[in-house]
Every structure is written in C-alpha cells, then in structure tokens.
C-alpha cells in the first residue's frame, strides 16, 4: 500500500511530483488559484482530487474526507504556505538605505550599514503558516513536510517558524529543520528552500546530497548539473517563442553583457569606457545572464521585462528551458 498524501497550497504540484516519485499516493491537493488547479488536473501523472479552496476555510476532517481517508488511516501532509511575506523583499531595509550603503562600499567610501527594524511588515498571509499547522493538528497525520523560502529564518520571520516547530513538538512530532539545495540533488538551479520534516515515529533524516560543486573532493558525489547541460538541444528553432525576442530600451546593453554577468558590465566599476549605470543602483538580477558552465540562479515567478536570468544568447528563456531548469 502506498502512503496517502494531501498537498496543501499545492500550486502547480511540485511537492506532489516529489511525493509521487517517492512512492506515495497523492490523494488530494488544495489550491486557491484557478490556473494552478487547471495545471494539476491536466497533469497526466496526477490522479488525486483537486480542490480549489482557501485552506483557512477547511477542517482536518474535511481534508481526510476529501482524500477518501478515515480518521485513523495513514496520512502525510505536505505543503508550502505563500512565501511572499517571508521573502527578502519583505524585510529589506526601506527608503533606499541599503542601496546607498552598498553603493558607498563599492565606491570605497566610508559607510555605515543601516540597522533593520525587527518588526515584520503586516501581511495576512503570514498567518497561513499556522493554518497549515492547524490542519495538521486537526487531521492528525503520521507526518508532514513544510516548505518555504530561506528568509523565513530571518529574525523578522523566525518567530513564525518557531511557533510552528514548538506546536508540532508539543503535539508529539519529532521535527527536523533543514535547508534543501536543489543544485545538490541534480537540478541545474541554485534554488534553496527551508524544510520542516515531521514524524510521530522517529526523528526524520534530511536527504543526503547526490551532487556537489566540489565533486572532486567529495568521493562518490556527482558534479552539479550546469545550465548548458540542462538546456542542451533546446536552442533549436522548433522551440522558438516570439516572446523570447528582446527589444526595447536595454536590448543592446543586454547583448554586451557577458555570460554570468549583469548590468554591472556597463559600470565604471567593471572598467566600461562609457558606463551607463552606477554599481549598486539596480537589483542584482537586472540584465542578468546565465553562464552555460554553471547552474542557474533561482528563476523568478513574476519577473519584470529586464529581470534575469536571460539566456546567454541574449534572449528570454523559453518555456521548455524554464521547465528544464526546474
């Protein structure tokens, strides 16, 4: 019998894919976004119930009923509450203080690092972490997997994570907190995520890396996958998309950026004879270009028109390429 799983905040089903690959039976997914629900329903590998719903309106009993499970049937719950309240943008120093500090440092001027306030910005979505816990408490699964961005560990966000962990431990769960790095598990992308692994039987063990940037020093570990390897064959004309063509204000600048570089290639700091930009005046991923010899940076969910990473051939990434890097 395969272990039943319920996926909360399911999105397009990333954790469901992982659970399925691990031999589990994903019985149900709960997701609020209608487009994501359609993606779940069209996934040929997925055969569970898709519920378009706000998790805060559901009970633990309703979750088990949705998955066709009785009160005492084995169950694991997985999910990642919305990350936006915990992302770097949510705790970055405001009013440009951080940018001024970094610019002064880059120019060799004396500067004092601004102090951040430890109060988090108001965002109701922060409460969804404990809604995830509430559903665990009410449905009483054998274990759980919770996922979020690394910055949920930031001092402004840590109390939310600790409240979850403390509640789980008081309820009898062994909890392991770990930082997962996609690049260490055969993915050509330097995406990192915090995971809480919970079990009522014994303390869960975090999976060991299979790949390493220092593979020559790590015995049996494989070398990390590069973007060039992951995207091999996808630069073919049959995969062309009109949206990949870059036009507009910074198109010529993008073409001059070397692989692995960003807008700083057009600064005096980088030795450009006719600099357009001053270093530390743009976000680091502005005009950012992939290096085919290295893993990709994390792909942004909703990038702006000049937000990278761009392909090293000075175009936007194609859908099949973004999928290959995920």
Residue ranges and their predicted role:
Residues 78, 177-179, 195-197, 298:
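Conserved hydrophobic/aromatic beta-strand scaffold that supports enzyme active sites
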Residues 161-175:
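Conserved Class I S-adenosyl-L-methionine
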Residues 150, 173-184:
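Conserved S-adenosyl-L-methionine
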């Amino acid at each position: 019998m395969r272990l039943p799983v319920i996926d909360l905040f399911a999105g397009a089903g990333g954790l469901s894919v992982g659970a399925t690959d691990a031999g589990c039976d994903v019985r149900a997914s709960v997701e609020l976004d209608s487009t994501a629900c359609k993606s779940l329903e069209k996934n040929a590998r997925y055969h569970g119930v898709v519920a378009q719903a706000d998790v805060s309106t559901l009970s633990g009993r309703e979750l088990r009923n949705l998955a066709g499970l009785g009160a005492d049937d084995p169950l694991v719950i997985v999910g990642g509450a919305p990350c936006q309240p915990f992302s770097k943008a949510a705790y970055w120093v405001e009013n440009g203080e951080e940018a001024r500090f970094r610019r002064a440092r880059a120019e060799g001027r004396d500067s004092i690092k601004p102090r951040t306030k430890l109060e988090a910005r108001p965002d109701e979505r922060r409460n969804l972490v404990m809604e995830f816990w509430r559903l665990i408490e009410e449905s009483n699964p054998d274990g759980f997997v919770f996922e979020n961005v690394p910055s949920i560990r930031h001092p402004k966000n840590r109390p939310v994570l600790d409240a979850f962990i403390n509640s789980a431990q008081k309820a009898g769960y062994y909890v392991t907190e770990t930082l997962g790095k996609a690049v260490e598990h055969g993915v050509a992308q330097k995406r990192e995520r915090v995971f809480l692994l919970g079990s009522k039987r014994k303390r869960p063990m975090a999976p060991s890396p299979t790949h390493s940037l220092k593979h020559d020093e790590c015995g049996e570990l494989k070398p990390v996958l590069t973007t060039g390897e992951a995207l091999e064959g996808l630069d073919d004309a049959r995969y062309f998309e009109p949206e990949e063509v870059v036009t507009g204000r910074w198109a010529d600048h993008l073409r001059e950026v070397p692989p692995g570089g960003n807008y700083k290639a057009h600064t005096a700091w980088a030795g450009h004879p006719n600099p357009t930009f001053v270093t530390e005046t743009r976000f680091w991923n502005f005009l950012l270009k992939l290096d085919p010899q290295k893993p990709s940076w994390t792909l942004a969910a909703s990038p702006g028109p000049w937000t990278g990473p761009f392909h090293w051939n000075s175009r936007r990434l194609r859908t099949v390429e973004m999928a290959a890097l995920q």
